[in-house]
Amino acid sequence: MVKAGSNAFRAHEKRDAIYKVSTFLVDNFWGNPPQMADALGVLLLIWNNALYRYGPFDFSALENTLRKNMSTLKSLRNRDILTLGEGDERTIESLFAAFLNALKIAEGKLQGRQSPVSVAKALHLLAPNFFALWDDKIAKAYGCHYSADPSGKYILFMKISKNMVECLRGRVPAPPPSTILKVIDEYNYAKFTKKWI
């Protein structure tokens, strides 16, 4: 079923080029916060256009958040979600809160609007085998809607994603630069967001 969802995603969505480019840019500019902020911006401004059409986030705030959290991000960069444990929750909560603030709309009529979706997308690009992707409909489908306690709901969603990876690893291919978490997101997007399957 996950493979069918991923195939449906790839048949309908041409935006995977943005994921590939953003992944490449983050890899290429890793350790350089201004360039990393630009790399994340490529994906966020396109993938989360529903929010950022009302106003951009502050790239300087994102750059500062990256700089302040670089050692933590380095420690998570090559982690696998299967290593997720209770001891990670405080770190994830802290990162989530920092990125939630950095990625809020900086100007315009929705100034200050925050996006847990943008946070998950940014964190995933920074540690693609550790942080899961979601959107509003996907979060609701898994009982993790984030209108209250977004970081806590994201941790719950990561635990659910970890269980899915445990079941799927080695059974569902993830062609580079995709990860098994990206393939699961493609399935979730096809099933819950677009209802293609």
Where are these regions (language model features)?
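An N-terminal alpha-helical hairpin/helix-loop-helix interaction module that forms a charged
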Residues: M1-L110, P128-I197
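Short hydrophobic alpha-helical segments that form membrane-spanning helices or hydrophobic packing faces
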Residues: S118-L125
